[in-house]
Amino acid sequence: LTPTEEELEAMKKEPAYGQKVLYYMADGCTAGPTVAAHLGYYEEAGLEAEGVKGNSYTEALGSGQATVAVGHIATMLVPITNNVDITFVGGAHIGCKSLYVLADSEYNTTEDLKGTNISAPNGIGKSDYNITCLLLDADGIDPQEDVNITAVSADACLTAMTNGEISAALLSDTFAYGLVKDGTLKCVRSLLDEDFADENCCMIAMNRTFVKENPVISKKITQAVQKAHSYMRDNPEEATQMLLDQGWNGGSYEMNVMLNNSLQFGLDQDFTEVSLRDVVEKYVRLGLIQNMDNTDEIMSIAWTPVLD
């Protein structure tokens, strides 16, 4: 991680040299950039860093208010094709959302959900909608024709299920954990299922113009975040306790260790590129990306492998 003499000389010639890396402060499974700062990895990479907060990492990255963040492909991919100034630079983890139904309901598979209302809590056209479409499509269910995807906020989904307004909802595994454990909900399809376990859910993303103008600094930033992800993967108990102590994870220690172990933090570049391309192809086919239809062209802006 420490820059070589050659890297340091190259960094000094880049416009962002001497400026603080603005990492987007997030918690839970997207805390990699924050953990990198806490463990001193940016300094080790020859960089100064400062955390920034906001309502949307997509807006923060696209406007240059943040340099780096970890977040859902499903949140950022469509904006990237709509000229938002973001590119993916590395993989983060698999997981971390699933389709849930009432445990005592008649629904046991996605096939059973045909003709019903399913909630994508953060809204139509947003990340939950996109993920729901992918999960249904994988089982041969047309998300536009075979079901009705609607928006019911996560905290209202249980009531809506009980009242029969919706059959299922896409929820974060963290949110649903206690409800599954107490027998209220069951999972019928997940991004952790075997056929999705070879796809990134979340990725390291950066401001695209910054990456273009500062390739070596961008490489060192990405390496710092990847080192944090490796730490989280290799030391799940210690990392979980640290995240809880810092207030970056909610819920129980037991739940967080289990979920952190399932996410496979720190995915390599080849895996990430192949899985991103696969997701792009699905988004184009399902009409989730509407203003571009060439996978290579989309990949040319969405994927910048700074570690190569």
Model-inferred region functions:
Residues 2-151, 167-173, 184-190, 197-198:
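Short, glycine-/small- and polar/acidic-enriched structural segments
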Residues 45, 88, 240-242, 291-293:
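Short, hydrophobic secondary-structure boundary micro-motifs
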Residues 66, 162-165, 262-275, 302-308:
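Short amphipathic alpha-helical segments at helix boundaries and their inter-helical linkers
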Residues 73-74, 150, 155-245:
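Pocket-lining segment of extracytoplasmic ligand-binding domains
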Residues 212-290:
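Secondary-structure end/capping motifs
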Residues 280-308:
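Conserved C-terminal helix/tail region of periplasmic/extracytoplasmic solute-binding proteins
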